[in-house]
């Protein structure tokens, strides 16, 4: 009997070692997967797929700039303890002050084992400015087709780490991506009806290149990315001169930037700011745009309305 007990202990130990080596977590006992997302957009997509099956921590607070961020002690702790970490990649958290690179290095986390870029598979667009030329444009989520890629990558890694809930994740993924796909198709039809001479989305940061490509609306901006100088007199003058040659009816300003440079552009061109829109963050809970889906629907509706005036 003693020998049998010893063999049973060895057998169970072997199972635990295999599970640890494969990176899978045993969630049958009710212990949830610990997941970290770098920003509110990725966190919301993750929540739509994982529901209450995980413990989720989002690092960059709603409304703050994910390009350059200083992690708090809680972020460091949660990252160190995480079973799975999702980040955007393509020059967002790893550009600027490279805060995410430092965070995962200090937590001794390994890429494609502990942390994964949800943008894997996106058709990347590159920056064009003198100081940023050749670097990746990180704002891929502003094209709903890329949001679907994000969701699929998230579901894949959740299922790999937590196979006990794979069916649950895949069911939620299907429902969620069908919803995003429907909004994407409806929005493309809407933008196709706007006259070509009115099609120009003007924002503070040049974050809408992926949006432009997806919905056939060229973009113009004051500065290209939030890691460079923002709203200099020269940048404003360049945009004002460009807009005077167009028939664009409306300007837009993002919720996460200083609106003063765009107000100057509006005054100098007599083109009104139609609406505040979202780029790097969803809205606070309970407000319009408080999820990735509602943020994108709000953006698509407001931009179409503003350009149709």
UniProtKB/Swiss-Prot annotation:
GO terms for biological process: cell adhesion; metal ion transport. Changing residue 248 to T: In strain: NA-1383/97. A lipid is attached at residue 20 (S-diacylglycerol cysteine). Disruption phenotype: Reduces growth. Severe reduction in intracellular Mn(2+) accumulation without affecting intracellular Zn(2+) accumulation. Severe reduction in survival rates in oxidative stress conditions and in presence of human polymorphonuclear leukocytes (PMNs). Changing residue 207 to C: In strain: NA-1383/97. Changing residue 9 to I: In strain: NA-1064/97. Changing residue 30 to S: In strain: NA-1064/97. Changing residue 294 to N: In strain: NA-1383/97. GO terms for cellular component: plasma membrane. A lipid is attached at residue 20 (N-palmitoyl cysteine). Changing residue 16 to A: In strain: NA-1064/97 and NA-1383/97. It is a lipid-anchor. Pfam families: ZnuA. Changing residue 164 to S: In strain: NA-1383/97. The keyword Signal applies. It comes from the Bacteria. Mn(2+) binds at residues 67, 139, 205, 280. Changing residue 193 to N: In strain: NA-1064/97, NA-1383/97 and NA-1508/92. Its main location: membrane. Gene3D superfamilies: Nitrogenase molybdenum iron protein domain. It is found in: Cell membrane. NCBIfam families: ABC_lipo_SloC. Zn(2+) can bind to PsaA but cannot be transported by the permease into the cytoplasm. At high Zn(2+) concentrations, Zn(2+) binding competes for Mn(2+) transport impairing growth and rendering S.pneumoniae hypersensitive to oxidative and polymorphonuclear leukocyte-mediated killing. PANTHER family: HIGH-AFFINITY ZINC UPTAKE SYSTEM PROTEIN ZNUA-RELATED, METAL-BINDING PROTEIN HI_0362-RELATED. Part of the ATP-binding cassette (ABC) transport system PsaABC involved in manganese import. Binds manganese with high affinity and specificity and delivers it to the membrane permease for translocation into the cytoplasm. Also acts as an adhesin which is involved on adherence to extracellular matrix. It is an important factor in pathogenesis and infection. This is Manganese ABC transporter substrate-binding lipoprotein PsaA. The gene is psaA.
């Amino acid at each position: 009997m003693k020998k049998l007990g010893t063999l049973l202990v060895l057998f169970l130990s072997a199972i635990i070692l295999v599970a640890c080596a494969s990176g899978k977590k045993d969630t049958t006992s009710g212990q949830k997967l610990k997941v970290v997302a770098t920003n509110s957009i990725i966190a919301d997509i993750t929540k739509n797929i994982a529901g209450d099956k995980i413990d989720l921590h989002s690092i960059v607070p709603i409304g703050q700039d994910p390009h350059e961020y200083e992690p708090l002690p809680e972020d460091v702790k949660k990252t160190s303890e995480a079973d799975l970490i999702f980040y955007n990649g393509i020059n967002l958290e790893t550009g600027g002050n490279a805060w995410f690179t430092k965070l995962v290095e200090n937590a001794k986390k390994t890429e494609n084992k502990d942390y994964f870029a949800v943008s894997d598979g996106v058709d990347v667009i590159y920056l064009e400015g003198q100081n940023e030329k050749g670097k990746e444009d990180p704002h891929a989520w502003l094209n709903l087709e890329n949001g679907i890629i994000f969701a699929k990558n998230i579901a894949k890694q959740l299922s790999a780490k937590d196979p006990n809930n794979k069916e649950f994740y895949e069911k939620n993924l299907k429902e969620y991506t069908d919803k995003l796909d429907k909004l994407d198709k409806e929005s493309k039809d809407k933008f196709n009806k706007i006259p070509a001479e009115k099609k120009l989305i003007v924002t503070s940061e040049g974050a809408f290149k992926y949006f432009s490509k997806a919905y056939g609306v060229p973009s113009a901006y004051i500065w290209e990315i939030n890691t460079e100088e923002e709203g200099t007199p020269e940048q404003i003058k360049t945009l004002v001169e460009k807009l005077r040659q167009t028939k664009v009816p409306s300007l837009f300003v993002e919720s996460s930037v200083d609106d003063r440079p765009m107000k100057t552009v509006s005054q100098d061109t007599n083109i009104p700011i139609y609406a505040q829109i979202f780029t790097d963050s969803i809205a606070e809970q309970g407000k319009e745009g408080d999820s990735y889906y509602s943020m994108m629907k709000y953006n698509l509706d407001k931009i179409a309305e503003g350009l149709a005036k």
